[in-house]
Amino acid sequence: MYENTGCFTGHRKLPANKIEKILMNLDREIDNFIAQGVTDFISGGAVGFDVIATSLIVAKKEMGRNIRLIFALPCKNQDANWDEKQKALYRDLLNEADEVIYVSEEYSPFCMKRRNQYMVEHSAYCICALLHEKSGTGQTVRLARKKGLKIINVVD
C-alpha cells in the first residue's frame, strides 16, 4: 500500500563539516528512490535535516518531477519555540506541501514519537541522517528496521 512512499528522519543539528556530504548523498538517494518509483515523500517538518530534505523535494517538484510532499507533523504548534527565521521557512515549506497530517492537535510528551511512528508505518523507504543511536532519529531508524523498510543513511 505504501510501496511508493519514503520518509525522512535526521538530527536537528548536523556537524558543519558533514553538511556538504550529507546534501550530496541526500540528493543522489532521492533521485535513486524516484527512479525506483517512489512518488511520495513524508517529512516530519523539524528544524535541521527535515528542512534540508524537504527543500530538496520542493526543488525537484519545481524542476518538474512528478512527486508529492507530505508533512506528518507532531502537532499544530510544533514551531512554537522556534525563532522567526525558522518559522518563516517552515511556513514557506508547508505552503509547498501536497498534504499535511497532524498526528496530534496539541503538543504532548508523546506526539513526536507518534509522528515518527506514523511516518514509518506509511512508508516503504527511509532516508536518514543518523549520527547518534540514542536519539529520536535513532529510535525512528530502529522502528523502520523492525518494520522492514529499506533504509539509507546519507551520513555514511
Short names for language-model regions:
Residues 1-156:
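Acidic/glycine-enriched connector segments
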